[in-house]
C-alpha cells in the first residue's frame, strides 16, 4: 500500500514541495530566507486581518480607530505593533533574500527571478499603502509626495494623479481605496509566491558553489525542515524583542500627530526600508529624472541575468566580484542613511555620488570585473 501523502491529490503537492523535495546537501543558512518570508507573509495577513476588524477607513475616524485598537481592544497594541514591525522584518528578509540571489547567481533562473522582482514591487506597494492607513502626519504627507511623483509623467501625469486620489487632493476617497488595495494585495502576493515556488521547483534550488548538484541531493524533511524551524524561532525572537521592548524604534514620531493638510512636517520621509530608493529619487534635481531613477533602482534587478558575463555562476570563487558586491551593499546602507537626512550639504552630494555608484556597479563595474576574472582563469 503506497503512503497516502504520495497518492492523495492535495497531499502529493505538499509532499513534493516540503517533504520529499530533493534539495542540495550544501545549501547554507542564506537559503533559509524563503521560508522566513513565507512566515512574515503569514504573520502580516493574520495580524492585518484582526486589525481590519477594528479599523475604519474614514479620514475623520482612521487615526482614532488605530488609537482605539491600541487602548481598548484585547492585545490590540500587540497585534498593531506586530504588524508594523513585521513589515520591517519582512523587508530585512527580502533584502537578504535578494542579496543572496545576487551573490550566488540565482538570477540565472529567469522566471523565478523575475517573479521575485514582481513580488518585491508588490510588497513595496502594499507597505506604502499600509503606511498611509493610520492617517498620521507622515501617512498623509508621504501619500501626497509619493503619489504626486506620477504627475511627472508627460501629458497624462496630472490626470493620473487626480484619478488615483479620487479628487484634487489626498482625502477620504484616497484612504478608502488604499485600504481596499492594502487588504487585497497580500492575497495576490500569496498567489505570486505559489508561482515563484512553481518555477523554482521546475529547476531545483541553486547552491553556494553554483554547480549542478543533481548527484548530491537530500530530502527536504527532516534536514531542512529542522533548519528552517531554527530560523523561524530566531525571527520570532527578534520580532518579539522589537515589539515588546521598543515598538516605535523604526517608526516616525510625526505619525503620532493626526494628519493635518495645513501643516507640513519639517522632514517628509518614508519608512526606513524605502529610504535607499528615496535617496536616489532626491539625488536628481529633475522631477521626471528622479522618478525614472526611482523606478530603475528596483527594475534594474531584472537586468541581472543579462549582465551576467562570468563563466562561473556563483561569486564563491570570484574574490574581485565579492569585493564589488560588498561595496554595493555598503553603498545601499549609505543611501538608506542619506534618505533619512535633510536636503542640505554635505548630504546631497553624498547621495548623488552613492546613486551614481549604485547604477555604475550594477551596469558597468560588475560585468567588467566578470570579464577580467574570465581572463584570469586562462592565465
From Swiss-Prot:
Heme 1 (or BL or b562) is low-potential and absorbs at about 562 nm, and heme 2 (or BH or b566) is high-potential and absorbs at about 566 nm. Its cofactor is heme b. CDD domains: cytochrome_b_C, Cytochrome_b_N. This is Cytochrome b. Keywords: Electron transport, Heme, Iron, Membrane, Metal-binding, Mitochondrion, Mitochondrion inner membrane, Respiratory chain, Transmembrane, Transmembrane helix, Transport, Ubiquinone. One of its GO terms (biological process) is mitochondrial electron transport, ubiquinol to cytochrome c. Belongs to the cytochrome b family. GO terms for molecular function: metal ion binding; ubiquinol-cytochrome-c reductase activity. Binds 2 heme b groups non-covalently.
